[in-house]
Amino acid sequence: MNLLIKNVALLSMKEEQPLMENTNIYIEGDTITYIGEINPDIKVDRVIDGTKKIATPGLINAHTHLGMSLLRNYADDVPLFDWLSKHIWPVESKLSAEDVYWGSLLSMIEMIYSGTTTFCDMYFFMDEVAKATEEVGIRGVLTRGIIEESDAEINKEKLRDTRKLYNTWHNKADGRIKVMVGPHAPYTCSSSYLKEVVELAKELNTGIHIHVSETKKEVEESFQKHGKSPVKHLKDIGVFDVPTVAAHCVHVSDEDTEILKEMKVSPVYNPTSNAKLASGFAPVDQMLKKGINVALGTDGPASNNNLNMFEEIHFAATINKALNYDALAVPALEALKMATINGAKALLWDKEIGSIEVGKKADIVIIDIDKPHFYPHHNLISALAYTAQASDVDTVIINGKIIMENREIKTVDVEKVMYNVEKRAKNLIQR
């Protein structure tokens, strides 16, 4: 189908001209083919009126755990290690494949409602996440979470699972699914096991998605065990020799950030989750000023407790000003980059998504700015970073397909998903 979005303001995320006050976007199939004045020679099947709206690249949630929506509001006001060991991991051990399927569907619905078109997920039963991704029409990077166990055969099986996931789903669903390798963290995987993970990533020619330096305790224990920080440890054993999505990077030193820059690692900032779990705040402004590609994420819906990337953009842009006593820290456009083009770079997808440009995939969010909280329209970049709400998202296009229009999702029965999640979540806690 050929689409025209007409008379729309455009935040393209192109360096030379990020904002256009009024333009027209032509989409042919899954690709953006023309941006500019109305061209009567281009035939279209559908016209979307963009008057009093702004088109932006689809938001990219670069770190999350979608199936954890079943545990939203289940265990709150608890520090990370207690939260994991006493509350989350015991319940997760009872999860079924169907649980993860329905929980992931719910998370994808929530993301679409709030303008997210691409995610990077680490969980298990990833075939079910892939099926949900295919059905909903969203774009995703899937990583099977790998935690080393005492049984060597189980550990080998986890690597085989990842290889199978890659062979089954990588570049499938019209190219909307990619697969990376997902070791949970350096404190849950030994050096020798991580080296096996790296070899698998090299074999598959893909990246690694891992938690890094999320808490002070993790860093302290790394120094006790290895005599170095988690970042230095991961570099020394070769993890950063492949493209790495490093979730959190909260407690990182100047030496660590130099390593992240040198090895072209992409940290993912999860400010709300890090704040809620009292983990701290990553030195994002300093990393950005060093030229490090920092992406943005929500973390899981059980530790955030939502998947609203507009909240993350707003928080990322504001809290860093307070932390640094610097009103210029993480300006509005930089926060928006973290949620779009930086996320695309982190996920090795920036040649296709992350900005609205001719030749790129049509992952576009149309936001209604004809609302009281948007007026007056002095600066639309500031408005998107500091003012926009998830409920302002009107239309979502992914891979050239209209997934949501007038806030109605077209690909999945939302009521059915909510019903099944409520039923399964209550049952899960009682198992």
UniProtKB/Swiss-Prot annotation:
Cofactor note: Binds 1 zinc ion per subunit.
Positions of Zn(2+) binding: 63, 65, 211, 299
Binding site for substrate: 92, 144, 184, 214, 299
InterPro entries per record: Amidohydro-rel, Deaminase_MtaD/DadD, Metal-dep_hydrolase_composite, Metal_Hydrolase, MTA/SAH_deaminase
Domain of life: Bacteria
EC number: 3.5.4.28, 3.5.4.31
Role noted for this protein: Catalyzes the deamination of 5-methylthioadenosine and S-adenosyl-L-homocysteine into 5-methylthioinosine and S-inosyl-L-homocysteine, respectively. Is also able to deaminate adenosine.
Family to which the UniProt record says this protein belongs: Belongs to the metallo-dependent hydrolases superfamily. MTA/SAH deaminase family.
Identification of the protein by name: 5-methylthioadenosine/S-adenosylhomocysteine deaminase
Gene that this sequence comes from: mtaD
